[in-house]
């Protein structure tokens, strides 16, 4: 899909490391943010292989602090090419952070958002730069979402993202009861048997996730403590829709661009983001912003 962010953004990321060298030391906050993002991305270019805790497998470590484990089949569970999956996820992580952090800090094509979001960019950079454990791990058909983020509850626990390579490849889960395949998915008994014992079923209507950098940034945003809701501003969804060309589920670029622009407009609403939590919840309802998520879901089919 094409949204107004995708054109030329790869070139923007390549230039980001160069731009920081051209900004004077006395530049304003924008220069500091450019430098912070570029510094983080530069650190994450440094990779090394280390054994996992059990010692039976290798993990790819980025910047000495972010571990990628069990991702040889990333992005799809039936693709296995040695180290290729690890390196692909590392690239998606860097790309997603570059695009997402630039966007929410007001340095991207959307222009300035409310300062609330620049503070979130700073918080995420600080989190990714600290020494707390951070793990991106891949699983197969073990979640009912494309990916799940687990924020650390205390300093002794790691921040973790589980990416279901089975789910994002668009395959029907094998974790349901036979009656569910028969009654809900309307599969015949022979097809149920083939699905459970052979190659899994892939329907045209099942979504194959495409914007993987956006998915990774979406999950990392959960590490800031945000959860999904429609009772108040869903920060995670707003960031993904505004910063990554709309919803990954909508093939119509024109419709998607409209949703993207609406999300960015919400992120610029000073009245909403200046408010305390209780007032923001009321404004979210009064301004009709809650309708955005519902309309995106309807447009996704």
Named regions from a protein language model:
Residues 10-21:
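Bacterial N-terminal signal peptides
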